[in-house]
């Protein structure tokens, strides 16, 4: 049985691309037709590409690897966080801080600081400090949690990135390429598919479309992890 059906893709509006004037000619092979000034994505190709990405994700998880979900645009934030958590993976859904991968040493120091603040809160340090200082520390903690909360358990480089909208997440993709980390991404008709290792042609602007594809990728990870457990 297919991991995703044409019916599911249609219902979620995955086939709706961008206006024809905002397109990248390199996406031509994934476009089925044009309707009312909007490109319609060929869902038969999307099904094949989802299956390909599913297999990659599943294999990484079976090998005990990790995947970083990246989606900072409003339509992606919730799905990226939920599906990463559901599959026990990491996520960035607020803002990609330059160097999150290429300068991971520095990011790790910020994560250590976040852990330190969490410990201070847990062990009662906050209760004995002056109120003004606690307010300042809490503010620092909240800020770190907001931007780094989804990767605070990530101890080393991920084995792949799952990205929603490569145009929006260009810096993340550049960093992944620099480090030789493969990128799996939902690619809309206005994006450049050459920047992505595993293209999933689809609507990256509709919450339901993003949720459907992100949850399918999370399912792949969960299935892959079960493979690890059964082999163990």
From Swiss-Prot:
Molecular function GO terms recorded: structural constituent of ribosome
Record GO biological process: translation
PROSITE patterns xref list: RIBOSOMAL_S2_1, RIBOSOMAL_S2_2
Keyword Ribosomal protein in annotation: yes
Keyword annotations of the record: Ribonucleoprotein, Ribosomal protein
Cystine connections: none
Key word Ribonucleoprotein present: yes
InterPro entries membership: Ribosomal_uS2, Ribosomal_uS2_bac/mit/plastid, Ribosomal_uS2_CS, Ribosomal_uS2_flav_dom_sf
Cellular component per GO, a single term: cytosolic small ribosomal subunit
Listed PANTHER family: 30S RIBOSOMAL PROTEIN S2 PROKARYOTIC AND ORGANELLAR (PTHR12534), SMALL RIBOSOMAL SUBUNIT PROTEIN US2M (PTHR12534:SF0)
Membership in a protein family: Belongs to the universal ribosomal protein uS2 family.
Record protein name field: Small ribosomal subunit protein uS2
Originating organism: Alkaliphilus oremlandii (strain OhILAs) (Clostridium oremlandii (strain OhILAs))
